[in-house]
Amino acid sequence: MPQAIQTLLTQYLSEIQKIYGTHLKSVILYGSYARGDYTSDSDVDIMLLVDLTPEEMDAYSDALSELGYEYNVNYDIWMMPIVKNLQHFKQWAAAYPFYTNVQKEGVVLYEAA
């Protein structure tokens, strides 16, 4: 992965932590950047696992969207976060092919202590 992308991911993770605080439990990079088969047009796929209900997650969606827009405009990169409840993800990881794929190919960028 290019150093510039690693640097942006580190910055992005810091901003995500500010948005979600202690509710953020794990951040997983998946997709082309995790597999190493990215191109110059690739977006950055990120799974954010939180301890919030879907209704509670809605309260954070505007801040998350604004952050994504900022990265697109300022750095010409698409950060594509998907936010899921951690327990839901764990419970259904074996049954949902998408979740299985994230677990299989994903690179953990952050894990709460």
Task: Specify the residue positions occupied by each region the protein language model found.
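Catalytic core of pol beta-like nucleotidyltransferases
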Residues: 1-23, 35-40, 51-113
